[in-house]
Amino acid sequence: MKTKLKIAATLTIVQTLLMGATIASAQNGRVVNDSWLYENYTKREVMVEVRDGEKIYTAIYEPTDEYLSRIGKQKSPIMLTLTPYSRKPYGLKPGETENGKIRGVYYSGLTGDMANYVADGYIIVVQNVRGKFLSTGTYENMRPYVSGVDGAADTVVVDGKVQTDDATDVYDSVEWLLANTKNTGIVGVKGVSYGGFYTTMATLAKHPAIKAVSPQAPATDWYMGDDAHHNGALCLTDSYRFGGGFYRDFRKPSAVGMSNLVKIKEDIYEYFRGKPMDELSAFFGDSLRFWSDMMKHPDRDQFW
């Protein structure tokens, strides 16, 4: 099921002029905080329909025309990031309050790792990948790449079913964004860990508008070198405790994440020491598809 991604070192961080001017702007007296965002950025949430009919939750943060004018720009490049994690707040618009405060309306990354891009007037786009939170469809833990060497432009149909992967979702999303935002036609994609994997998929999509990517510490091979296994050895603590919540399927789109089935109050070493794998797996039953798949494939095979 999982195809090992062979990623050239040159792909790890591809920085172009798209991303080159951000440092200076943060030093020009623009302090990006929630109040500043309220004055200079708008927020809208849309469901972008992709080629198989599923809909991807997309939060779009756009500079106002007044702000673009002040910094001498008419249009903005797009910075896209994709995640399986919550990117709350969902539903709130600028000017609305959460617990009586404007703070919380904006995705927190806008004042963090995205602050330089925001100061430069970028359009910031945050998506939940399919099957997570408000995005429809079924989540698969690192979907295999099926689009082929030419990228994700063409729709592939097998036995009457449209074939999709994270690259096709990115390609279709970029098409929508180019048509529905005030942009320069230039897109960058960045992300860390899971986000790094989705950034890699964005690269493989080969959309001509994607000019720069930064897949940082990407998840790429669950069996050899990531949080599920290290060189084939099961990473029990992370897979079991983290997976007890993250691997659960959303029954329907929701702004609220799934609770964790695992509640370990004692010393975790002692907890695992006293339990065979069969007992640990029986605790989950059939509720965690990825855990069940790992138990069915203890050795490196075509699944990985």
Locations of the language-model features?
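Catalytic nucleophile serine of serine hydrolases
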Residues: S135, S193-Y194, A217
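Alpha/beta-hydrolase fold nucleophile elbow
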Residues: T181-S193
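Accessory cap/linker subdomain of secreted extracellular hydrolases
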Residues: G100-R103, Y107-D113, A119, P144-T155, ...
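Bacterial N-terminal signal peptides that target proteins for export
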Residues: M1-T12
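Cap/lid segment of the alpha/beta-hydrolase catalytic domain
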Residues: R70-L178
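N-terminal cap/lid segment of alpha/beta-hydrolase-fold proteins
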Residues: R30-Q74
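Bacterial N-terminal signal peptides
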Residues: T10-G20
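Glycine-rich nucleophile elbow surrounding the catalytic serine of serine-hydrolase chemistry
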Residues: G191-M201
